[in-house]
């Protein structure tokens, strides 16, 4: 009987929530981490307008809603909305009773302690889970790539981290966090499309720009060279059809938007680019393990999905590293979901079963138990 109850694995990202069952090779449910509330109250009585919508339903009704993301920069900032997202995950997406399944959640590196406690409290007290564990996202991505040592560049919708990991443990002193990720690139693309005369302003229109970004953007190997090519010919131009049938053309914006990952100054940020952040993280580690890190730079998250990003990263890090150093960039094809996949692997390991925090332990010790059991 013991065997049949699968653990749930939920990766709550700033942009998308990925959820499913431990042991599966992909998440069952992937939906936007958004909660939408009607902009205007229903006029027709009995139309059954809800006071809030979550995920895909919020996305499809976005024209009449105000959309909010409860997770910003990887960190939960609105617990009431977060609870709605979890409720939706359990009951509508996975269709499970949370009180029957152990639950593995993920968190951003350097997540504030209070957040970790609050997460633990909600899962046990609101949803009555029998067991719970929280794991760091980047560590799970590394597991998914079949490694226990390496440096993970995890870039999602809300935040980018470079996380050096040695023998399965993240090295907190060397973690770099960049508040520059997919959402910022979407905003930047909105801005540079405006310069072309296309206006996108509402939260609903921002979602259209996100789609343009995901379908058409790429990273140039040599940015200046690419700009020249774009200026001299129309070979890089692509067209995109808007929902109303209007067709827009996009040229150098295709690679100008993601270039901000390497040159954050384009967004008016003083941050290091992702290549420098990776290098700085490695340099904060012990000299003896740097070779292992340079040789295992693992990319994860949706913002690392641009064509050309791995080659560009290779070129940039090679230029920063000692000349004889072997640099290897690993960009697994499933990297959009590698955090979730790592969670699925971890939660189904027989050796992991003693790591869960049980409801009983929680009742005895309170939320603080999460620091003792989840490292």
Swiss-Prot record:
* Enzyme Commission number(s) of this protein: 3.6.4.-
- Enzyme class comes to hydrolase
| Location of the protein in the cell | Cytoplasm, Cytoskeleton
Q: Tell me which residues bear Phosphoserine.
A: 324
Coiled-coil stretches, from where to where? Answer: none
- Zinc-finger in keyword set: no
Q: Which GO terms describe its biological process?
A: chromatin remodeling; DNA repair-dependent chromatin remodeling; endocytosis; transcription initiation-coupled chromatin remodeling
Source organism superkingdom: Eukaryota
Classification via InterPro entries: Actin, Actin/actin-like_CS, Actin_CS, ATPase_NBD
Q: Which residues carry this modification: Phosphothreonine?
A: 202
SMART domains reported for this sequence: ACTIN
Q: Does the keyword Protein transport apply?
A: no
| Keyword line | ATP-binding, Cytoplasm, Cytoskeleton, Hydrolase, Nucleotide-binding, Phosphoprotein
- Which one of the record's GO molecular function terms can you name? structural constituent of cytoskeleton
Which cellular component terms (GO) are annotated to the entry? actin cortical patch; actin cytoskeleton; actin filament; cell division site; cell tip; Ino80 complex; mating projection tip; mitotic actomyosin contractile ring, distal actin filament layer
Q: Name one Pfam family in it.
A: Actin
Q: Which reaction does it catalyse?
A: ATP + H2O = ADP + phosphate + H(+)
Question: What family does the Swiss-Prot or TrEMBL record give for this protein?
Answer: Belongs to the actin family.
Free-text function comment from the UniProt entry: Actins are highly conserved proteins that are involved in various types of cell motility and are ubiquitously expressed in all eukaryotic cells.
* The protein, known as: Actin
Species this chain originates from: Schizosaccharomyces pombe (strain 972 / ATCC 24843) (Fission yeast)
């Amino acid at each position: 009987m013991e065997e049949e109850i699968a653990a749930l694995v939920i990766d709550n990202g700033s942009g998308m929530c990925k959820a499913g069952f431990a042991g599966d090779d992909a998440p069952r449910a992937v939906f936007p981490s958004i909660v939408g509330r009607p902009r205007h109250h229903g006029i027709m009585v009995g139309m059954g307008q809800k006071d809030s919508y979550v995920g895909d339903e919020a996305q499809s009704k976005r024209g009449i809603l105000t959309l909010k993301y409860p997770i910003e920069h990887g960190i939960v900032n609105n617990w009431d909305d977060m609870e709605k997202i979890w409720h939706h995950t359990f009951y509508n997406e996975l269709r499970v009773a949370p009180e029957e399944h152990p639950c593995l959640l993920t968190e951003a590196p350097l997540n504030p302690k209070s957040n970790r406690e609050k997460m633990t409290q909600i899962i046990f007290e609101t949803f009555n889970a029998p067991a719970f564990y929280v794991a760091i996202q980047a560590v799970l991505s590394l597991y998914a790539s079949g490694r226990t040592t390496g440096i993970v560049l995890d870039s999602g919708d809300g935040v980018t981290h470079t996380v050096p990991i040695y023998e399965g443990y993240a090295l907190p002193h060397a973690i770099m966090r960049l508040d520059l990720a997919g959402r910022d690139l979407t905003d930047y693309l909105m801005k540079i499309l405006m310069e072309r005369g296309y206006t996108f302003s509402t939260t609903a229109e921002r979602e259209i720009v996100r789609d343009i970004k995901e379908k058409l953007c790429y990273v140039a190997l040599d940015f200046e060279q690419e700009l020249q090519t774009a200026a001299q010919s129309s070979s890089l131009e692509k067209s995109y059809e808007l929902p109303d049938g209007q067709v827009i053309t996009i040229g150098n914006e295709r690679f100008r938007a993601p270039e901000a990952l390497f040159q954050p100054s384009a967004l008016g940020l003083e941050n290091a680019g992702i290549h420098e952040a990776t290098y700085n993280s490695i340099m904060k580690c012990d000299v003896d393990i740097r070779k292992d890190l340079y040789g295992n730079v693992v990319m994860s998250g949706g913002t690392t999905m641009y064509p050309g990003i791995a080659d560009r990263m290779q070129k940039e890090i090679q230029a920063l590293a000692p000349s004889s150093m072997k640099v290897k960039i690993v960009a697994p094809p499933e990297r959009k979901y590698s955090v979730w996949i790592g969670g699925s692997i971890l939660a189904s390991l027989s050796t992991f079963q003693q790591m869960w925090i049980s409801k009983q332990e929680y009742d005895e010790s309170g939320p603080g138990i999460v620091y003792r059991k989840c490292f």
